[in-house]
UniProtKB/Swiss-Prot annotation:
Keywords: Cytoplasm, Lipid biosynthesis, Lipid metabolism, Metal-binding, NAD, NADP, Oxidoreductase, Phospholipid biosynthesis, Phospholipid metabolism, Zinc
Cofactor field: Zn(2+)
Oxidoreductase in keyword set: yes
Family: Belongs to the glycerol-1-phosphate dehydrogenase family.
Organism: Methanothrix thermoacetophila (strain DSM 6194 / JCM 14653 / NBRC 101360 / PT) (Methanosaeta thermophila)
Residues bound to Zn(2+): 176, 256, 272
Protein's recorded name: Glycerol-1-phosphate dehydrogenase [NAD(P)+]
Length: 354
């Protein structure tokens, strides 16, 4: 792994190939050959996504002269990552492929990072921007931790498959993208008040991506392959913005902290992108921005715009708002040192989240 010799230098790692479109999965072998990969590939997938993509990937790789095997994974926990690493070592894998939703791809990221071998990202749903970023989510001691790894060597997004995923997943992905609005506002605030490093280019790419999804919200439809392509491209752009910045700052701010706090207090009440979308409404209000625009876009996209839609009690929302600043205390946001209970309730009620 590369170690930078000077503190002023920065290391930017981006995917070398992105193939997105209907039938893209069939190109996996050609992409691997083009990237000069060779030897054995280990496909990491879930029990449901194995039949959707995992087995087809292994077969396509075999047809192109690669050896390939499949390992089924479940929750992204340290023990599961260790199990996959051991499997990859025993198999003598030369590269990994994460195929499925966020869990399989996160495990592939972490295992590949620790084994110092490349990995490819093959999403089967457009539910979050982790499909392209160097950040991996890991469940540790009942909490979700963001772990820096490396960006995928390539992304193969078959929008024919992705468009057939449950509509809720794509709506959640849109919520994750729209949350870039407040993530950038938080980042700019940290730059002004804390002199935090800030990348104009990464911020511009992230903001443009969020704006594109909001502007195109009326034409993004479930089960529609062109819509899936739009959302996938936006998620990839968001992931690239994080790679350019060298952190998750362009796509993760106070709204993500709220989402993680909510999931800690009441686990499993909503998908990551859904919680981030709701958080974005509140955080945009706190920033003095157009929170109504965020709320309306989420509703048009079929994503929840209130806690009631996810059966989350009002008191849980208020508690999450008062605790959110503790999720990443080193990351300065509009939440500052925390909201009082009264301020949290007022923000949630004003924005009609509760």
């Amino acid at each position: 792994m590369l170690r930078m010799r000077t503190r002023s230098a920065s290391w930017m790692e981006l995917p070398r190939r992105v193939v997105a479109g209907a039938g893209a999965l069939a190109n996996i072998g050609d992409v691997c050959v083009d990237l000069r990969l060779s030897g054995r590939a280990l496909v990491i997938t879930g029990p449901q996504t194995r039949s959707v993509a995992g087995d087809n990937l292994a077969a396509s790789l075999t047809d192109c002269g690669f050896e390939a095997d499949v390992v089924i994974t479940r929750d992204p926990r340290p023990a599961e990552v260790d199990r996959v690493k051991s499997f990859a070592l025993d198999y003598k894998a030369d590269f990994l492929i994460g195929a499925g939703g966020g869990r399989s791809i996160d495990i592939a990221k972490l295992a590949a990072y620790h084994l110092d071998i490349p990995y490819l990202s093959v999403p089967t749903a457009a539910s979050h921007d982790g499909i392209a970023s160097a950040m991996a989510s890991l469940n540790m001691d009942g909490e979700t931790k963001s772990i820096p790894t490396r960006a995928p060597l390539a992304i193969i997004a078959d929008t024919g498959i992705i468009s057939k995923a449950p509509p809720r997943l794509m709506s959640a992905g849109c919520g994750d993208i729209i949350s870039n609005y407040t993530a950038i506002l938080d980042w700019r605030l940290a730059k002004r008040l804390k002199c935090e490093d800030y990348s104009e280019y990464a911020a511009a790419l992230s903001s443009m991506t969020a704006k594109m999804v909001v502007d195109m919200a009326p034409s993004i439809k479930p089960g529609h392959e062109p819509s899936a392509k739009v959302v996938v491209q936006a998620l990839i752009s968001s992931g690239v913005a994080m790679s350019i910045a060298g952190s998750s700052r362009p796509a993760s701010g106070s709204e993500h902290m709220f989402a993680h706090a909510l999931n800690r207090i009441a686990p499993g009440r909503g998908l990551h992108g859904e919680l981030c979308g709701i958080g974005t409404i509140i955080m945009m209000y706190l920033h003095g921005g157009d929170w109504r625009m965020i709320r309306e876009a989420l509703k048009v996209l079929g994503a929840p715009a209130s806690a009631h839609e996810l059966n989350i009690p009002e008191d849980v929302v208020v508690e999450a708002l008062t605790q959110a600043h503790k999720i990443r205390p080193e990351r300065y946001t509009i939440l500052g040192n925390g909201l009082t209970e009264a301020a949290a309730r007022a923000a949630a009620e004003t924005t009609k989240v509760i």
